[in-house]
């Protein structure tokens, strides 16, 4: 025989769903648990994540820790002489735009530095002020 104290609440999967708008005796009739007027009573309304009813949200109450220069950093890329030998032909002009076009550097780069790795097998035209040559590359091409 089943006793009253031995009854258990059904598991969440078997629990009956809340029926809304089915008359006053259901306890969820008329406004369907949405209250009167305001955004929350309207269809399609969703409160954004972290909203605390107009109070100062947690992410603003907690103090910031540290500081990052990431958003202020200037994007300076490096490219090797070995890579330039592969990407460019003899006598070609090496510019920032040409390097971006060949996807040798990041599209957000504002300057590129050429560093030595292997020999410089071809001669190139260096006119772009944003393409900086390292001391080793200057020695290779004979520019002091």
From Swiss-Prot:
List, alphabetically, the InterPro entries matched: Ribosomal_uL15, Ribosomal_uL15/eL18_sf, Ribosomal_uL15_bac-type
The record lists the membrane-crossing segments as none
Role according to the record: Binds to the 23S rRNA.
**PANTHER family hit by this protein:** 50S RIBOSOMAL PROTEIN L15, LARGE RIBOSOMAL SUBUNIT PROTEIN UL15M
Of which family is this protein a member? Answer: Belongs to the universal ribosomal protein uL15 family.
State how it assembles. Part of the 50S ribosomal subunit.
What's the protein here called?
Large ribosomal subunit protein uL15
Question: What is the gene name?
Answer: rplO
